[in-house]
């Protein structure tokens, strides 16, 4: 059984390392990594946007209730008009890929946990 609701999506997105949330543009709950959005869920309107690969984008927009996301569709973001437009297990995989794609381009120091030393700092400590 799939939990297909904003709370389940929120829990899933915030489980990723360094993921944060911020309410933006009225009722959009944005999930971010390093200050960059990897998924957006509507609180008042059950919709979801996320980034995907060009191949997945082409396949998804052929489905009912899925289309290029407004303003960012040209960057291969899709919008699901209904949270149940895809199966829960498929949605989890799509969000995971979005997170990984955005995290790969996000500045590392923005999502490094406080208190964790950089590689350079650890090397200096070993030599001292």
For the regions a protein language model found, what residue spans apply to each?
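Charge-dense, helix-prone N-terminal extensions
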Residues: 1-128
């Amino acid at each position: 059984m799939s939990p297909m609701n904003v709370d389940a999506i929120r829990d899933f997105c915030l489980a990723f390392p360094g993921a944060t949330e911020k309410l933006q543009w009225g009722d959009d709950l944005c999930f971010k990594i390093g200050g960059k959005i990897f998924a957006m869920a509507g609180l008042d309107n059950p919709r979801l946007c996320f980034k995907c690969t060009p191949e997945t984008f082409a396949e998804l927009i052929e489905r009912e209730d899925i289309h290029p996301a407004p303003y960012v569709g040209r960057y291969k973001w899709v919008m699901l008009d209904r949270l149940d437009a895809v199966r829960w297990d498929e949605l989890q995989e799509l969000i995971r890929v979005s997170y990984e794609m955005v995290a790969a381009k996000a500045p590392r120091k923005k999502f490094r946990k406080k208190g964790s030393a950089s590689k350079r700092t650890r090397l200096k400590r070993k030599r001292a």
